[in-house]
Amino acid sequence: MELATRSQIPKEVADIFNAPSDDEEFVGFQDDVPMENLSESCGSLDSLELEKQNACLHSKYFTEELRRIFKEDTDSDNEDFEGFTESELNIGSNPELIESELSDGDKTHPMMSDEEDDDDEEEAAPRRGRQSTRSSFGLRVAFQFPTKKTAKTPDKNSPHLLGGKTDLRREKSCRQPKEKEDSASDAEDESRAESQETSDALLKRAMNIKENKAMLAQLLAELNSVPDFFPVRTPPSASRRRTPRRAFSEGQITRRVNPTRSARPPEKFALENFTFSATKLTEELYSFRRRKTISGGKCQKYRRHRISSFRSVKDITEEELENIAITVRDKVYDKVLGNTCHQCRQKTIDTKTVCRNQGCGGVRGQFCGPCLRNRYGEDVRTALLDPKWTCPPCRGICNCSYCRRRDGRCATGILIHLAKFYGYDNVKEYLESLQKQL
């Protein structure tokens, strides 16, 4: 039985199993199904072929004889296929089988999806099942060899790709202005909303200010309608604020005393502390006691000489005469080296007068050039060169503030401009004219 079945295998079929297939791919094995469901499996296979359009599942070697062999059921599942013998390979010279294979090879698609072919296959299947008495393989293989489709790499310079790129660029360029327009419109909407909010806030503020002003005016009107509730205080007049000026009395004048100043430096200010040694102190005491015993208990008294500013005409030098101040601008102030003027009490370094009276001395007889000319109408140069010249205080005509206060009169102040206005050359003549009028 096994030999009978093997004798039916042609050489071309054996070549299919023995020859290596480089251009064909093995899809897989088909499960064992009974003959009753074979037609249904073939229908499902056809539908699957229609779904997979890109894969070509037909082969030129898939003949009718090969289909019949694989559709037959095996008698025993334990038998294995061990290969083809030489006799089976030589038997393939049967002309009938060769013609059937050639006729089947001319067909491009042996597994057609037409209804007529399906009916023929369903009728031939039970006939082959009855006639076959051999034991076939335990495995049935469905040879479906899809043709390889080489994946064509797209050319970068192809017109289709270039056209697609240009289309994409155009779309992007169209989208960008649209996005800009959308963003600009959004920004305009936001700015309008903000301006609307600010305008609403300003209007609300103006309304509140107006209401507050109206309320304040109403309250002030109500307060003014009740004058007794809030009495209005009249400010005191300026005449009441002024204290009456004390009239100058002709009575006794108190002596002028310098006020006590808290800023006055303490006693012994800026004095150096000289330390004496004990030996020197004992020597001084010893010498003092010795002089006392020698003199008979009486200490020697030295005669005190009063330093006077009296200077003769011969002592006046030409430099001192040139140093006389004619105007106020010629006076140079110096609190260390300068001497004080009796009239203006300013300490300057210019040359001043010297009183020739023996009982006068110090600041009393010193007058600067502007004061002596404006107040008394005299010149410092002639006073220095006159050996008999005496100062105004010694003559009793001094009109300074201290001398007038001592005599019970008030200070005159600056009267030179008023005296010149009335035609007088100095203040002394103007005061004498006033005294005559009284």
Swiss-Prot record:
Localization terms from the record: Cytoplasm; Nucleus
Record PTM text: Phosphorylation increases its interaction with PSIP1.
Region (MYC-binding): 201-223
Cystine bridges: none
Keywords, comma-separated and alphabetical: Cytoplasm, Isopeptide bond, Nucleus, Phosphoprotein, Repressor, Transcription, Transcription regulation, Ubl conjugation
Regions of compositional bias (Acidic residues) in chain numbering: 74-85, 113-123
Compositionally skewed regions (Basic and acidic residues) per UniProt: 166-183
UniProt KW Repressor keyword: yes
CC terms in the record's Gene Ontology section: cytosol; fibrillar center; nucleoplasm; nucleus
Covalent link Glycyl lysine isopeptide (Lys-Gly) (interchain with G-Cter in SUMO2), residues: 210, 213
Motif (Integrase domain-binding motif 2 (IBM2)): 62-88
Claim: Metal-binding is one of the keywords in the record: no
Cited InterPro entries: CDCA7/CDA7L, Znf-4CXXC_R1
Subunit structure: Interacts with MYC. Interacts (via IBM motifs) with PSIP1 (via IBD domain); phosphorylation increases its affinity for PSIP1.
Name of the protein: Cell division cycle-associated 7-like protein
Organism: Rattus norvegicus
Gene: Cdca7l
